[in-house]
């Protein structure tokens, strides 16, 4: 598969065409950003780790009946994915109060939620990705009621699977954001990535109750380098994947 012209560059990834019109090449960058890109720093090895982590998680989800756009990882920072028509949405699932949820609703970080909260944010840099509801999305022709009737249950199914996956490696899944799109045959697919960039992950190994971040909050809050945390997540996920018979790159 040949990598051709660059189609798009975001904060954390680059997207390239290939010699197959139905396949795209994703390159993971070493850049970390926070605060709508105002805080920015490169971390050597971040792109490699996020490529590995996304590949492992998508493979674990596939074993649990959840399909994604992933075809395969091709090198340290690259992967091949199916071309999908993306919804311009960040789909957020929250299991524990943290981040924007706390500041918006005045609740304490770490509060366990009685049930998972599903939220939508419109992908728009100029508007800082505003919070929107179902009616907003339909009124603005972002998606249809029928789309949402598929998106919501799939998002909740992904949440249940990820809670189980991360619990097996002694990590609490606090919240995460995902994206979805439709393949050319109309199938709704999980797309983009699932990494410590897009999840809040709290280590549970010492059982002390103290919050130890294994995610990008380390960078957002100036708590230290993200690389050791990302390496820890990759190593634990790799061991789990191997135990389930999934081939993992060394």
From Swiss-Prot:
Lineage: Bacteria, Bacillati, Actinomycetota, Actinomycetes, Bifidobacteriales
UniProt keyword terms in alphabetical order: ATP-binding, Ligase, Nucleotide-binding, Purine biosynthesis
Keyword Nucleotide-binding: yes
GO-annotated biological processes: 'de novo' IMP biosynthetic process; cobalamin biosynthetic process
Protein name per its UniProtKB record: Phosphoribosylaminoimidazole-succinocarboxamide synthase
An example Gene Ontology molecular-function term: ATP binding
Pathway(s) annotated for this protein in UniProt: Purine metabolism; IMP biosynthesis via de novo pathway; 5-amino-1-(5-phospho-D-ribosyl)imidazole-4-carboxamide from 5-amino-1-(5-phospho-D-ribosyl)imidazole-4-carboxylate: step 1/2
Gene3D superfamilies listed in its UniProt record: ATP-grasp fold, B domain, Phosphorylase Kinase, domain 1
Domain of life, source organism: Bacteria
CDD domains reported for this sequence: SAICAR_synt_PurC (cd01415)
InterPro entries: SAICAR_synt/ADE2_N, SAICAR_synt_PurC, SAICAR_synth, SAICAR_synthetase
Reactions that this protein is recorded to catalyse: 5-amino-1-(5-phospho-D-ribosyl)imidazole-4-carboxylate + L-aspartate + ATP = (2S)-2-[5-amino-1-(5-phospho-beta-D-ribosyl)imidazole-4-carboxamido]succinate + ADP + phosphate + 2 H(+)
EC id: 6.3.2.6
UniProt entry tagged with the keyword Iron-sulfur: no
Protein family membership: Belongs to the SAICAR synthetase family.
């Amino acid at each position: 598969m040949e990598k051709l012209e660059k189609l798009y560059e975001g904060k954390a990834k680059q997207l390239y065409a290939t010699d197959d019109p139905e396949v795209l090449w994703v390159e993971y960058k070493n850049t970390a950003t926070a605060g709508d890109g105002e805080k920015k720093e490169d971390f050597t090895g971040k792109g490699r780790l996020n490529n590995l982590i996304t590949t492992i998680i998508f493979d674990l989800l596939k074993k649990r009946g959840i399909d994604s756009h992933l075809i395969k990882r091709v090198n340290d920072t690259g992967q091949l994915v199916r071309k999908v028509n993306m919804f311009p949405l960040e789909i957020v699932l929250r299991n524990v109060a943290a981040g924007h949820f706390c500041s918006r609703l005045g609740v304490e970080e770490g509060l366990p939620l009685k049930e998972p909260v599903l939220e939508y944010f419109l992908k728009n840099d100029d508007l800082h990705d505003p919070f929107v509801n179902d009616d907003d999305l339909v009124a603005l022709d972002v998606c249809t009621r029928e789309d949402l009737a598929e998106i919501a249950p799939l998002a909740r199914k992904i949440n249940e699977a990820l809670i189980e996956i991360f619990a097996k490696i002694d990590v609490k899944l606090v919240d995460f954001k995902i994206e979805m799109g439709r393949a050319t045959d109309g199938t709704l697919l999980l797309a983009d990535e699932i990494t410590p960039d897009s999840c809040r992950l709290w280590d549970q190994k010492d059982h002390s109750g103290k919050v130890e971040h294994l995610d990008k909050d380390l960078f957002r809050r100036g708590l230290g380098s993200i690389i050791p945390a990302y390496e820890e997540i990759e190593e634990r996920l790799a061991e789990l994947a191997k135990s389930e018979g999934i081939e993992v790159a060394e």
